[in-house]
Amino acid sequence: KIFRYLVLLASLSLHAAAWGDMADNGVECSVVMEKTEFDARAAFPDFKLVFTNKGEKTVRLFDDFYPLKDNGPHISIEIFWKLTKEKKEKVAAYYPHYCIERGQFLNFITLKPGERHEVLIKDAYLLMHYFGPSRRLRNGEKYELEVIFRDGYGDPGVRRKYVGRKDFSVVDQSPWR
């Protein structure tokens, strides 16, 4: 009997890793990168934040990704250096450091079951602040991109955090190697 529970638990944990990060409303958030291998000398590639409604009900998201034309996106971006499978260290981040006065005209994105919505994040390399002595990504290393979108208006009185992650590696693409 204990063996059955262990097998069931292992099965559920493997499925959870494949599902990605899903909020309590059934919306899964994932990151799709233009390139998952690039040279450290190249600009950080553009990526998409993808929201997929895997639930059974229609859901609405607060359309707050680019609230101000002249500022960066209203999301948090973090890059972690993957030291081991479990251990990682933050090497770069972008946090929106501006306040927005909310008016009466709020825009929402409606996702029916099975629908998805993509948000293109361009020129993230201009937004990132690198930490540590090297202040850059290093060739030959593996990293994880983590993007966080906080929605406090999609459902009245409910604050949700959507997290998307994607692994990538930085490789030397020099023609002289």
Regions found by a protein language model. Name each.
Residues 37-43:
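Short, solvent-exposed loop/linker segments at the N-terminal edge
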Residues 19, 113-177:
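Surface-exposed edge beta-strand/loop patches
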Residues 45-47, 117:
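Hydrophobic core residues within well-ordered beta-strands of beta-rich domains
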Residues 49-56:
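Asparagine-centered strand-capping/turn motif at beta-strand->loop junctions
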Residues 62-111:
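The feature marks short-to-medium sequence segments in extracytoplasmic or secretory-pathway proteins
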Residues 30-36, 102-107, 129-132:
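Short structured motifs
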Residues 5-15:
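Bacterial N-terminal signal peptides
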Residues 19-26:
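Proline/serine/threonine-rich low-complexity linkers at boundaries of modular beta-sandwich domains
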